[in-house]
Amino acid sequence: MPTTVDDVLEHGGEFHFFQKQMFFLLALLSATFAPIYVGIVFLGFTPDHRCRSPGVAELSLRCGWSPAEELNYTVPGPGPAGEASPRQCRRYEVDWNQSTFDCVDPLASLDTNRSRLPLGPCRDGWVYETPGSSIVTEFNLVCANSWMLDLFQSSVNVGFFIGSMSIGYIADRFGRKLCLLTTVLINAAAGVLMAISPTYTWMLIFRLIQGLVSKAGWLIGYILITEFVGRRYRRTVGIFYQVAYTVGLLVLAGVAYALPHWRWLQFTVSLPNFFFLLYYWCIPESPRWLISQNKNAEAMRIIKHIAKKNGKSLPASLQRLRLEEETGKKLNPSFLDLVRTPQIRKHTMILMYNWFTSSVLYQGLIMHMGLAGDNIYLDFFYSALVEFPAAFMIILTIDRIGRRYPWAASNMVAGAACLASVFIPGDLQWLKIIISCLGRMGITMAYEIVCLVNAELYPTFIRNLGVHICSSMCDIGGIITPFLVYRLTNIWLELPLMVFGVLGLVAGGLVLLLPETKGKALPETIEEAENMQRPRKNKEKMIYLQVQKLDIPLN
């Protein structure tokens, strides 16, 4: 019988010193993904702004106006509800360099009423109420150019989509280690180049390149750590690898507070990727990949190194390692296999919708917080903290209660929290923060559970394909989310939350249509996957009837 890596790790250590060392190193990689995934909150922060009008600054200085008086005297008031504010995107067509203006009410000297004064575009740029800078303030991504901020964030998600779709083949073809080192090098270079980009176009190009490699590198780190540990620890290290990403969120909030200028922030969060190049000497190639390439001797050498690091010794009977042979006819998976049969088709549609919804709500809530929050740094920090209890609740519930009910409940909590936030008055900001944190915790749980359940619902020969196809909807959601958030807030600040609420509640209801996978073996065939929903007693009754039918002709 073939000796597998899992068999050897039972003797050489499934999660001992070596695996803990690898987990720490790869967890650092996971943490540095946070600034790329949600850094738009700080990089693309849009402060209060108004049109710059030549002569206003000089008049304000001559008259000794306070900032509030300058706004009241020289800037149009807010527009009607549901319309973009003229204060931000329009200015009075007035020559403020005239010496006839009075300091008390300068516009009163004009013949026409203030409400009838002609308004024009911001030809001379904007004045931003912020001590720092962002890509919005530097490249004037406001008013007619505000869609360029949406495009900036969508570009990184386009990169995620392309990179994650191709990373499986690349990592299987060239190895995990080479692929990891290549992605971190490109990610580091693109991040630094983005920080010194002279124009919006160059910044957009480097952001797209970051998207192409950053999520791919994060996924390779996930693959590596799960391949280094024994089977009993894979789920746990997978969850804690995502917890490391949450630590990255907390660090990002602190760094962004210390560095309010986007170029320095981008440069600082990109530098650690150069450190990961040292992993060439720290992290070995995956033994499982080496075996798949028939490099058994090299795989055995690495496994002996793992055992030595763990203070273990391998029995002589386990000194030879062979790849398990697949029996039966080899099947070639295709997309049609995901929709050909009724139950698997239902699973595919629900999983795709849940991946999409998880991405939209997760990224959307963070982006909306950047627009609606009073203190962007504290709000971001508090909402990131709730991801820790989310991870521990998953660990406590999925093997006790199951996957389906916690998954459905987390989606519904996220959706209900979004809807509840809409109706909380602005003077109850503390309550709004608590409800928002509940929503963030709910969607974090949903996001992590869909990663787990996706693989458990598909038979072996289409499992990888099913995970890749369904999870690609996560990146599609990320592409759409910036346009959804930033465009809808121009209509009404709370409108995105209403959309998120409906999406989350529907996702929770659809999850209840899926079978429970707790305690069930992974399906090996289409038939097993199709029968997952059926109660066991019905299956036994069907088998009994079949036996009776077979007995009748023999009498």
Swiss-Prot record:
Side Extracellular, residues: 44-150, 199-208, 260-263, 370-375, 436-441, 486-494
Membrane topology: Multi-pass membrane protein
Pfam families per the UniProt record, alphabetical: Sugar_tr (PF00083)
Mutation effect (Y362F): Decreased TEA uptake and YES1-mediated tyrosine phosphorylation. Strong decrease in TEA uptake. Strong decrease in TEA uptake. Strong decrease in TEA and metformin uptake and YES1-mediated tyrosine phosphorylation
Impact when changing Y92F: No change in TEA uptake
Protein name (database record): Solute carrier family 22 member 2
Post-translational modification note: Tyrosine phosphorylated by tyrosine-protein kinase YES1.
